[in-house]
């Protein structure tokens, strides 16, 4: 009997050590920053330079007036609760997600690194290169640097949510009823395998006229992620928590399904992460009075 127990214990130890490399691979797949991934091929990156001969969309901003709005939900994820009334000062936000054309101007002017995937994603980059498709494969720092170059900043979570849902606590930019083809998301026959030209879905338009909040690509915002922040944050202009491990992403995308397409849904990722589903837009703490270029 003792010998049998010893054999079982020894077998469990062997299995535990054998599992460690697998666990490491899983952790690496989820958490490894872009810089540790295989190098990007020049051929893959060059595809971004040959964007379609399409006139760039106008670089517009929308001013969101000061006032209260209802943030969060009563029935979503734990980190979306409780539902509370929050006051946000006047700000302006990009009407559209930042496009490839706009980001390429930034790269050309500053020498900032190009958006690009690890080699394992290289085949997909050709489908994301359109002039007016949202730029993707950008980290949180890339997005933040672009906004600063433009004299802007990333929107806070509170600003982003107000801009996309208005003041009446709606679940989607258009209202409270899900529309299968209302935005560019997964598992619908909308004619788009990947991201679409910004503004392609007229229904995906907030009460203020901000486009693509429910679909197309997810968007980096300014905040560090904190699970209980909807409960703990101040009632007026809640800033980002001071520190964290993950940065917040908001909005749905062309790979998004189910509850994640609601405007209240919160996602998170390490700041160095880059892939084809994440883009961004910028904001300013002022009224928009003209050209944003």
Where do the PLM segments sit?
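Short, structured beta-strand segments at or near domain termini in extracellular proteins/domains
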Residues: 276-290
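A short glycine-rich, aromatic-capped structural motif
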Residues: 53-118, 138-141, 215
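Residues embedded in well-ordered beta-strands
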Residues: 62, 85, 171, 219, ...
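Hydrophobic alpha-helical membrane-insertion segments, chiefly the h-region
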Residues: 15-27
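Short, P/G- and charge-enriched loop/turn segments at secondary-structure junctions
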Residues: 49-51, 78-83, 266-271
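Functional-site microenvironments in short loops/helix caps that host divalent-cation chemistry
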Residues: 64, 70, 74-75, 118-265, ...
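Ser/Thr/Pro/Gly-rich low-complexity linker/stalk segments immediately outside membranes or between
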Residues: 27-48, 55
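N-terminal Sec-pathway targeting helices
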Residues: 1-14
